[in-house]
A protein has these predicted regions:
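Short beta->alpha connector loops at strand-helix junctions that form conserved
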Residues: 90, 109-113
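Short acidic capping loops at alpha-helix termini that bridge into adjacent secondary structure
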Residues: 57-62, 82-85, 132
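Active-site phosphate-binding strand-loop segment of PLP-dependent enzymes
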Residues: 113-171
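Conserved PLP-anchoring active-site segment centered on the Schiff-base-forming lysine
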Residues: 78-100
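A short helix-loop-beta submotif of the ANL/AMP-binding
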Residues: 102-108
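N-terminal small-domain helix-loop-helix segment of the aminotransferase-like
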Residues: 1-67, 74
Length: 171
């Protein structure tokens, strides 16, 4: 059995990262950061996104967090009210369901099997939507399967969602 539930590294922290952490402690660089992250870091991220990914973001558009898990949870907690439904294609990352539970929402899972490359269809999405649906949580590439929705597949899902303007998409 191969456990695909969490992405725990199978390697030790690289020495240069350890040294940078030790240096930060030695230089008393240990206080709370600005909410969006240090501007120098946000500028470096903006430069990286432009140079390596061809994406143009202003540093003011970038928020640094403790990781994707924190950011996803923040969005869910800020937008999901008790009883709201969140549609989640499965298989899915183990933390999604727990985040929705924390917000007192209800998870609506939509099975996506190997025969459809672990991707939901527009028909499945439409069938999962109710008056209580508040969000579609869609991950592409999928965690844990690695499946990637094509442009046409995303467009077909977007066509369904266009009929429901109050449904948020968290991706």
């Amino acid at each position: 059995m191969i456990n695909l539930s969490v992405g725990e590294p199978d390697f030790h922290t690289p020495d240069h990262i350890k040294e940078a952490a030790k240096k930060a402690i030695d230089e008393n660089f240990t206080f709370y950061t600005p909410v969006a992250g240090y501007m120098t870091l946000r500028k470096a991220i903006a430069a990286k996104m432009k140079n390596e990914n061809g994406l143009d973001f202003a540093p003011e558009q970038i928020v640094v967090s403790g990781g994707a898990k924190q950011s996803l949870c923040n969005v869910i907690l800020a937008t999901i009210n008790p009883g709201d439904e969140v549609v989640i294609p499965t298989p899915a990352w183990v933390s999604y369901v727990e985040m929705v539970k924390l917000a007192e929402g209800k998870t609506v899972t939509v099975p996506a099997g190997v025969e459809q490359d672990f991707k939901i269809t527009p028909e499945q999405l439409e069938a999962a939507i109710t008056p209580r649906t508040r969000m579609l949580l869609l991950c592409s590439p999928s965690n844990p399967t690695g499946s990637v929705y094509t442009h046409d597949e995303l467009k077909a899902l977007a066509d369904v969602l266009a009929k429901y303007p109050d449904i948020l998409v968290l991706s």
